[in-house]
Regions:
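Membrane-proximal first intracellular loop
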Residues: 1-144
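C-terminal membrane-anchoring module of eukaryotic surface/secreted proteins
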Residues: 34, 50-53, 152, 180, ...
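Generic alpha-helical transmembrane segments of integral inner-membrane proteins
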Residues: 37, 41, 70, 149-156, ...
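Transmembrane alpha-helical core residues of multi-pass small-molecule transporters
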Residues: 64-67, 150, 191
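Fourth transmembrane helix
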Residues: 133-169, 196
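Extracellular-loop-to-transmembrane junctions of the mid-late helices
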Residues: 154, 158-161, 169-209
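Intracellular effector-coupling site of seven-transmembrane GPCRs
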Residues: 214-220
Length: 220
């Protein structure tokens, strides 16, 4: 591919690259926009229903997917070819995305973990009745404490981790450029996979419990 990333700084942006596009990029653009809009629309109704039922993690998961797909779709429409000279520099729009980039990815994984944890807790209930209003409020509070602290910290700490303002690429749009340091590794790279691993463990607990119970009954 004979294209290059256009790196934007405070002083302005480069206009050296010539306009360029090809059928592959056009197909990529169409698919990105179509599936991005479709995915966002498909999440609207579930998000409303889950929010009404007090399922905070699942509702935030849907909202996270909607926001990410809006970013992907709008970015593809704005920077749909390699005509760097005519590109919009992305001031404001890319600044917003840079601060939300890792936070949204981490929130996505945190939601998956919290959904699995809540499902495991509900499967483990031995009573027939549902949760009381007090238990639901407590569950919502715990979910909020699981979901939001790390993403909010990432948003607040982003300015200290960036090595430059941002860069822009065709179809992808805004890109974050981070400094290669241990805070970046610990507070930005590791949280999402750790949440994912914890989600797998939480999902496996009911299966493990179900496999242990028959063995205990057989022993008695």
């Amino acid at each position: 591919m004979h294209w290059q990333y256009a790196v934007f700084a405070e002083s302005g942006f480069s206009q050296e690259a010539a306009a360029y596009t090809n059928p592959g990029m056009q197909a990529n653009l169409v698919l990105r926009v179509f599936f991005g809009i479709l995915a966002a629309l498909c999440c609207l109704v579930p998000m409303k229903l889950l929010w009404r039922n007090g399922e905070l993690a699942a509702a935030i998961f849907c909202l996270d997917v909607i926001i990410l797909n809006i970013f992907y779709t709008v970015n593809a429409l704005i920077w749909q070819d390699e005509n760097v000279g005519n590109w919009w520099p992305g001031y404001g729009w890319c600044d917003l995305q840079v601060y939300l980039d890792y936070a949204l990815d981490t929130l996505y994984s945190a939601c998956v973990f919290e959904i699995m944890r809540n499902l495991a807790a509900k499967v483990a209930l031995s009573r027939v009745t549902g949760l009381t209003s007090g238990e639901k409020r407590r569950q919502t509070l715990i979910s909020a404490l699981v979901l939001f602290p790390i993403p909010l910290f990432q948003v607040a700490f982003t300015w200290f981790i960036l090595s430059q303002r941002y860069s822009v690429a065709p179809l992808i749009g805004c890109l974050s450029i981070y400094d290669s340091s241990w805070p970046y590794l610990v507070f930005y790279v590791l949280p999402a996979p750790l949440y994912t691993i914890a989600g797998v463990i939480a999902a496996g607990k009911p299966l493990l419990a179900a496999s242990i119970r028959p063995n205990e009954k057989n022993r008695t």
